[in-house]
Amino acid sequence: VEPNPAPRITIRYCTQCQWLLRSAWLAQELLQTFGPDLGEVALLPGTGGVFEIAYDGETIWERKADGGFPEAKVLKQRVRDRLDPERSLGHSDR
């Protein structure tokens, strides 16, 4: 049985809105928490107020639908629930 390939997380952000730093910070939070369990965290420049995070192509956060930007804790929980539902996130689970 082939192990599942490590997931790809994409963060599409609006360059006109200057959301690169926010995107990079969230990417760093995910990499710091999940490290080698993630295959890639990619930052994708966009326009038109876009801020969307996807896990292997499945949208897990969308700024307009979810009402703003995710807290790191909420984003980590959404990634964990797909990657390894049994994993404890320590203080991020409280």
Residue ranges and their predicted role:
Residues V1-R94:
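Domain-level signature for proteins that mediate thiol-based redox and metal-cofactor handling
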